[in-house]
Amino acid sequence: MAWYLRRVRAMEAEKRTTPTMTLLRWMVGLLSPYKLEVVLLIILSAAYIGARTLTPYVGKMIVDEGIIAGDRGKMLYFTLVYVGLTLLSWLTRMFRTYFSGRLNSELLYVMRSRAYEHLCRLDLAYISRQQAGRIISLITNDVSAVGNVVTSENIDLMINMLTIVGSVYIMSKMHVWLTLAALSVLPLLVGVTLVFARKTRQVYKTTREKVSLLTSSVEQSVYGARVSQAFTERRKIDYRRFSRISRESVRANLKAAMVTALINPSLSTIRAIATAIIIFYGGLLVTRNELTVGSLIAFYNYTGLFYQPIIMVATFYNVLQSALASAERVYLFLKEKPGIEDSPEAEDREILDGEIVLENVHFSYDGSKVFEGLNLKIRSKSTTALVGHTGAGKTTIANLILRLYDPQKGRVLIDGVDIRKYTIKSLRRQVSLIPQEPVLFQGTVLDNIRIGNPEATRENIEKTIDELGLKEIIESLPDGLETKVKPGGENLSVGQRQIISFLRTMVRNPKIIVIDEAMSSVDPFTEHKLQEAILRLARRRTCIVIAHRPTTVRVADEIIVLKHGKVVERGSHSMLIARQGEYARLYSQLLRQ
């Protein structure tokens, strides 16, 4: 249900309408770093347009001045000119296509890199509101749609517009009235285009929304394959949801296909009408000696040269509507301000002691209150366990300390300094999180550990492993540190993945470590090894452990019990057990589990 509500909120937010001119200015502005490439493409396009528009006129000269006049010399001359123009048209089109494709590839690379970097800067609050499939679709499909229109489609539009102007000019020089007759169907062409254009933007926007929802559904099914296969009911629910979204996607695509199916035949019919007018009226002019045969042939050729660009210009409007839907999503995404940024007073600071204080903290998720005036102090260079039922605020405290979120009111202090006065980079370099579900990447175990500190040498990593007493576990792997890791670490046990995640954090040499349910799924042997490592760490670092297991909680120097966002008890394990309060009840429940 929560997933569905997040989806609805995301779709409602995307219904915001950005002015078309704003989007067009932004799209054109994307080309500003590529001025030389654009100039080269304009020169190639101009040469292509000149060769293309002159070719039918030279064909006229071959017929009138060569064949009909019986002048072999002129016939040979104009034929050679015709071949030269055709060759020039072919060469300029080839080079234009190549350079346009190269510009398109470069622009897509820059846009995707920019979008990805922006995604990495956005805060957890924004990312948690979005679907992974929607973001993936934006960075891949939407960026491609925008890039294609800005480069190749935009250049094609310019060529088509200039081809229309050049063709009309030459046609009018040959015969004004026949030119006007050829243009007589233009109002009908414009009218048909405008009728269909009204619906296209929303239709294409809907299709892209459905594609992103379909991507999210597949992604969720892949990630949850183990659960779906274990619970046949869940598999049925996933299948029904996928089928529903897939049917909606089919319906949206059918609507888009219907628009396209109606536009292209309509435009082709109008072109056929224009051709018929030229042949009939032009034929009458030829019989009255008001037009040469060569000119009639040229007019016929110009019809194809003239109306094809008009059809493409009209179609471009529909392509543009599709691209504008994508552009709006990318534009709004890049305009999204990170909720967590460095404040003007932020400095690179060193954490010396590691004492943490939450002072009168108020915090809520989407209007649901978690803390109202929470005051909490965590001693430095000690291990503090946070316990409480689900929803008590344990993980929220971890997120606030890491500054993944900011409190709506109150402060979080480290060594007496508001963490907003630390730069985000310096804070997270010294405060590290070990999550419940470790994320491993394809490569070796050594590569995955080195993510925590790319500068760490193998000798330093081996020393850290030895100091933490984890050498036995690493050596038990098939190739030790050189063991290959499959995507997600699927070839390793949960315990092995968690050990690697733990070591990744430790090579950073953080001053504060937050361990969020990291031992909830590991085996007893791995848990024991991690507990020993934590005890070694606590001598010189501040450790915060969020856990449910009794053995994990018991080794903490101090235990803080949370209930409904408030601290209800704190003290050592033995002290709290003797008090027979909230902790004793929780501990008893944990033992029974």
Regions found by a protein language model. Give the residues of each.
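Transmembrane helices of ABC transporter permease
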Residues: 33, 37-50, 82-85, 152-206, ...
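Membrane-integrated ABC transporters
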Residues: 1-52, 67-78, 96-100, 104, ...
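Cytosolic ends of transmembrane helices, especially the final helix of ABC transmembrane type-1 domains
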Residues: 258, 305-333
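ABC-type nucleotide-binding domain
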Residues: 342-343, 349-593
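An intracellular "coupling" helix at the cytosolic face of ABC transporter transmembrane type-1 domains
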Residues: 124-125, 141-150, 154, 162, ...
